[in-house]
Design a protein with these regions (language model features):
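Structured interaction and signal-relay segments at domain junctions
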Residues: 13-75, 80-82
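Short amphipathic alpha-helical patches
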Residues: 39-43, 89, 131
Length: 141
């Protein structure tokens, strides 16, 4: 990845991290012959990753399968953080002008607090209904 491309994508990582918020990790991986590591990251506390962290196993699978030769990106695949959180992940394959893969822009979303909130709301709704009562007869006072 050349200097200008790094600058552009590093700015994008910072921008996306700020507008998407703490439930989204945004990571830029540079792919070199001798190392593949994170060179920019926003909200890394979500997964515990930091500058210099290696590629995830899922990303290594994508590289090994050469998925980038037929697709520009992969959307909404499940991954797991080092802390065991289930994440919704998305990855953009970054290519140079010659079509050679030089990086990955990865966005990982932790929806756990929204799933927990949804479950609590459903529990609340269920506790307001009297079991066995005919529909439409439950009054909420």
């Amino acid at each position: 990845m050349d200097r200008e491309m790094k600058r552009h994508y590093t700015l994008l990582v910072d921008f996306l991290g700020k507008i998407l918020g703490p439930d989204y990790e945004v990571a830029l991986h540079e792919l070199l012959d001798d190392s593949n590591e994170i060179i920019a990251i926003a909200n890394g506390e979500l997964t515990g990753r930091h500058l210099g962290s290696p590629l995830s196993n899922k990303m290594l699978e994508f590289l090994t399968s050469r998925l980038y030769e037929t697709q520009d990106y992969v959307l909404r695949f499940e991954s797991t953080s080092v802390t065991g959180k289930k994440l919704c992940s998305n990855s953009l394959f970054i290519k140079d002008p010659h079509g050679r893969l030089v990086g990955l822009l990865c966005i990982n979303f932790d929806s756990s607090r929204y799933r927990e909130l949804s479950a609590r709301v459903m529990d609340l709704c269920g506790s307001l209904l009297t079991p066995g009562a005919p529909s439409g007869t439950n009054l909420i006072v």
